[in-house]
């Protein structure tokens, strides 16, 4: 994503592997597109496909063509009415970004099979039968831009961190390590988006696919005294919640923490005895250290062994980001000089 951000004045990260780039004011988009593709491959080794069009929805259509047809060389540009019409005629209605399964069924009853058929429907019908989102998609396919760039990702309204265990867990000590780690991660995410939590949920459950084992599923919701993103507090209350729901005698498969009632501000409680300024300075220092040295500083309750961690035997290699996984190649080099060549 950093390589993409360097090429354009404005970028919206849409997902972990997808982004929208604002190319307004750029004349030679063909050259820029080719340059971006080459730079990403050189910098990461990852092939990337680009779809360029007047709107985000049309850009998604173009991107599908760039991925699907080798003749495009990973770059498809919809910059004329003829190209737009042809692309929509070749795109099934179910492949359009923003059109759900229920809407597809409704449109098919109207004889709509392709994206082009959809654009031929009267705008009044679309507005009446497909809500504001459907009308926006209809306009975007017409080439009318209706979706603004979100250069700053919206803050999450709920944060969940959970993980299945690598093996069944029966003791509360191991469960506490996992819960503390999940709660710590949630607190970190809160601080990253400058938010505060007003409540949290801790949950545990067994493996419901193991019919030969007794089943147990419980959760508890805890309302925090004041909105907070402090790791010590969130871990404390998550562990308190675990103690109320943990039951001995079961083999647990998964546990997690969900942060809810997220707000962008906090306020001190009347009887709050915690030195908030001191704790905030401590948290900032820990975040700064962990930013430079990943997860170097953590709470003792989180443990060090991580015996509960999910098994990850089939992970892809991190050849470009982990120095210990850099591929080494053994080869033999044959050298000769001009003098040696003359002697022969």
Model-identified regions with their sequence ranges:
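Structure-specific DNA junction-binding interface
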Residues: 1-68, 135, 143-151, 184, ...
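Short, hydrophobic beta-strand segments
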Residues: 19-24, 219-225, 266-272
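A short, charged helix-loop
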Residues: 73-90
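DNA-contacting surface of Y-family translesion DNA polymerases
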Residues: 105-249, 331
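Charged substrate- and nucleic-acid-binding regions of tRNA-handling and nucleotidyl-transfer enzymes
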Residues: 265-334
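Conserved small/polar residues in nucleotide/adenosyl-binding loops
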Residues: 336-344
């Amino acid at each position: 994503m950093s390589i993409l951000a360097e090429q354009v004045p404005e970028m919206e990260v849409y997902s972990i592997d997808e982004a929208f780039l604002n190319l307004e004011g750029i004349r030679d988009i063909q050259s820029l597109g080719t340059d971006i593709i080459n730079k990403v491959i050189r910098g990461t080794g990852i092939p990337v496909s680009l779809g360029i069009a007047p709107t985000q929805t049309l850009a998604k259509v173009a991107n599908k063509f760039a991925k699907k047809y080798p003749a495009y060389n990973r770059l498809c540009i919809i910059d004329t009415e003829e190209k737009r019409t042809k692309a929509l005629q070749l795109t099934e209605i179910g492949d359009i970004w923003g059109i759900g399964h229920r809407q597809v069924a409704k449109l098919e009853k109207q004889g709509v099979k392709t994206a082009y058929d959809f654009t031929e429907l009267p705008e009044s019908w679309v507005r009446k039968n497909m809500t504001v989102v459907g009308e926006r998609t209809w306009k975007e396919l017409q080439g009318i831009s209706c979706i603004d760039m979100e250069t700053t990702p919206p803050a999450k309204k709920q944060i969940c961190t959970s993980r299945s265990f690598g093996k069944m867990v029966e003791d509360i000590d191991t469960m506490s390590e996992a819960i503390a780690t999940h709660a710590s991660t949630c607190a970190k995410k809160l601080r990253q988006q400058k938010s505060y939590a007003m409540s949290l949920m801790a949950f545990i459950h067994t493996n419901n696919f193991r019919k030969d084992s007794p089943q147990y599923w419980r959760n508890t919701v805890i309302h925090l005294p004041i909105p907070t993103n402090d790791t010590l507090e969130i871990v404390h209350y998550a562990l308190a919640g675990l103690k109320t729901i943990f039951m001995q005698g079961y083999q647990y498969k998964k546990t997690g923490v969900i942060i809810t009632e997220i707000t962008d501000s906090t306020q001190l409680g009347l009887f709050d005895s915690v030195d908030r300024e001191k704790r905030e300075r401590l948290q900032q220092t820990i975040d700064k250290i962990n930013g430079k040295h990943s997860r170097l500083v953590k709470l003792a309750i989180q443990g060090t062994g991580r015996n509960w961690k999910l098994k990850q035997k089939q992970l892809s290699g991190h050849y470009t980001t982990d120095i210990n996984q850099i591929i080494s190649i053994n080869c033999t080099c044959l050298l000769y000089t001009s003098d040696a060549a003359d002697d022969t």
